[in-house]
């Protein structure tokens, strides 16, 4: 939203920003919900995938479209992106780590940081599934407490480091550990629905 004409209108800017936050939160919640149902369905058929099989399936599902999207974006970008510094950004996007640094976050596309977080969630999703399946309520509570602690620790560290740039806070509050509650709450909602629906 930076530099846009509506930025000077506080009410409009706040609504647009809030809408974006709500959209991202729903995206993560639905991702957790969908992953839980997918794994639960596989387990019901007696073929719950191991970590490698799960990641292989996820990669096949998201990587082709994701890489095509990045490649198309790069075709229309400045040739500076193909410098030594630019290659750092390209590598970060192709390895789903663009959200790790304020330098690469949003450098090719401002929305694709969510794919980095989603991919990192996939890396731990099979383990979270087992915890949520065992006790969805405890898992949800623990995830909320963990996320609050992580967010507080990040803000405190950045503040003590003398960093006042809001964009840096924006980036480091959008990591998988600071969005974990969204994913787990989505999984917990699916677990609750499955348990009540099976009665």
Regions found by a protein language model. Give the residues of each.
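Membrane-interface segments at the starts/ends of alpha-helical transmembrane spans
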Residues: 7-16, 164-171
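Aromatic-enriched alpha-helical transmembrane segments of multi-pass intramembrane proteins
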Residues: 28, 47-50, 88-113, 127-199
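Short beta-strand segments in beta-sandwich/barrel cores
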Residues: 34-35
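C-terminal TM-helix exit segments that contain a strictly Trp-centered aromatic cap at the helix terminus
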Residues: 72-81, 149-157
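Phosphate/oxyanion-binding loops and surfaces in catalytic or ligand/nucleic-acid-binding neighborhoods
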Residues: 1, 62, 74-78, 97, ...
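Short, positively charged
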Residues: 2-8, 158-162
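Transmembrane alpha-helical segments and their boundary/interface "anchor" motifs
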Residues: 17-28, 38-77, 84-96, 119-122, ...
């Amino acid at each position: 939203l930076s530099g846009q004409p509506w930025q000077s209108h506080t009410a409009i800017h706040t609504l647009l920003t809030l809408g974006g936050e709500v959209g991202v939160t729903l995206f993560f919640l639905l991702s957790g919900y969908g992953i839980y149902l997918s794994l639960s369905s596989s387990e019901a058929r007696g073929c719950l995938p191991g970590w490698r099989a799960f990641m292989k399936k996820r990669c096949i599902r998201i990587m082709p479209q994701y890489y095509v999207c990045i490649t198309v974006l790069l075709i229309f970008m400045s040739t500076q992106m193909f410098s030594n510094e630019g290659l750092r950004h390209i590598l970060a996007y192709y390895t789903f780590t663009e959200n790790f640094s304020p330098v690469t976050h949003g450098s090719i596309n401002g929305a694709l940081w969510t794919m980095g977080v989603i991919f990192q969630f996939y890396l731990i999703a099979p383990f979270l599934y087992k915890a949520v399946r065992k006790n969805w309520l405890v898992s949800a509570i623990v995830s909320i407490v963990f996320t609050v602690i992580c967010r507080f620790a990040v803000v405190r560290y950045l503040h003590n480091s003398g960093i006042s740039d809001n964009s840096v806070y924006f980036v480091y509050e959008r990591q998988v550990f600071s969005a974990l509650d969204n994913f787990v709450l989505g999984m917990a909602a699916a677990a609750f629905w499955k348990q009540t629906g099976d009665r």
